[in-house]
Regions:
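Short gly/ser-rich loop at a beta-strand->alpha-helix junction or flexible surface loop bordering the NTP-binding
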Residues: 1-212, 339
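Surface segments flanking catalytic/ligand-binding clefts of nucleic-acid enzymes
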Residues: 1-11, 18-26, 183, 188-339
């Protein structure tokens, strides 16, 4: 799940327990047998209380974060990459699932790092697993929040080639927007910076060995990603529309009508079709703010419709049925073309 409430990896690491001397080992062993501690990997434990009282997605997030931290703590010469490093950068990753990937020196003797299954009582939180270790010449890297990670372009390239395609697309959209300091209010300069960022990512991708996994996916994702997507939801909708072969799509389309300036999330300007993603959790902190926000949005919609725009609204729940969203857009296209 993508959620701002997910803890940082730094916070998760601070909660982990390691046996640093003999008396501590005995105490930890007793706590593990009693269920007060759960073992993440050999020599790395998490207090069970850290998981109690949370929804399953957050429990999975904490366990996955603990595994990432365990890899960093156990293998000091390894460099986290892909979605793990994206978490540290603040990209909109799905925190409760996904591979744990790291680069290791070619001379590294150990290839595998196994993780224990995690249970609270009889409830399985996460099955046993292992890290994906890539032995290679280590990329240039940095220390961020105490973790060794590559620089942003390499992280984004690895996300683009190793993550599931829809997630890879969303991460690359967010990454290019970040590299370009994208602003809807300065679109010309922002688009130029975004194209330079895209060029840099493609160059980084081309520098990888030919045998690297996922390079074809990464090339497609980087070539089609759009910095104008302001949320993972918008990115997922755009990804589905592109796969459906729909042409002439823009993001953050600037529209002037009745003395107002509006930005449409995803648009087909030639047909005046507006696809608006409602990703907000709430509209305000008071009843008055909620009413004012809803009234402003309704007036915005009326003005766009008076200017000839057909508006298709999409909510988070619709992302489970993207085929229906695409079908709705295709119907709107046929209706507009056939007028």
């Amino acid at each position: 799940m993508i959620d701002n409430e997910a803890p940082s990896l730094q916070a998760i690491r601070e909660s982990l327990v390691t046996p640093d001397h003999e008396p501590n080992r005995m105490r930890i062993s007793r706590a593990a047998r009693s269920g007060a501690l759960v073992r993440i990997a050999r020599g790395i434990y998490l207090p069970a209380s850290t998981l109690e009282g949370h929804p399953l997605w957050l429990q999975k997030t904490i366990v996955r974060g603990s595994r990432i931290c365990a890899l960093s703590m156990r293998r000091h010469d390894h460099i986290l990459t892909g979605e793990c490093a994206g978490w540290i950068l603040g990209l909109p990753i799905i925190t409760d699932k996904g591979p744990i990937t790291a680069y290791a020196p070619i001379s590294c003797g150990e290839r595998r790092l196994s993780f224990d299954a995690v249970r609270i009582g009889s409830k399985l939180i996460m099955p046993a697993g292992q890290a994906s270790i890539v032995r290679t010449s280590l990329p240039a890297h940095q220390i961020a929040e105490g973790f060794a990670i590559p620089f942003a372009p390499r992280i984004l390239v690895d996300c683009a080639r190793l993550a599931a395609k829809e997630q890879a697309f969303a991460l690359t959209c967010a990454g290019i927007a970040r590299l370009a300091s994208y602003s809807r209010f300065d679109q010309l300069a922002s688009r130029e910076r975004a194209e330079q960022a895209r060029h840099d990512l493609l160059r980084e991708l081309a520098s990888l060995p030919r045998s690297s996994r996922g390079t074809s996916q990464a090339r497609w994702v980087i070539s089609h990603a759009d910095a104008g997507c302001e949320s993972p939801g918008e990115s997922r909708v755009l990804h589905a529309l592109i796969l459906a072969g729909i042409k002439g799509i823009t993001t953050q389309e600037e529209v002037h009508c009745s003395g107002h300036t509006f930005f449409i999330d995803i648009a087909i300007p030639s047909l005046k079709i507006a696809i608006e993603f409602d990703g907000r959790i709430k509209y305000g902190d008071s009843v008055q703010e909620v009413h004012e926000r809803i009234e402003a949005e309704q007036r915005r919609a009326r003005l766009l419709q008076l200017a000839g725009w057909r508006i298709i609204r999409i909510r988070w729940s619709d992302l489970r049925r993207l085929d229906e969203v695409v079908a709705q857009v295709l119907v709107a296209i046929r209706q507009r073309v056939g007028r």
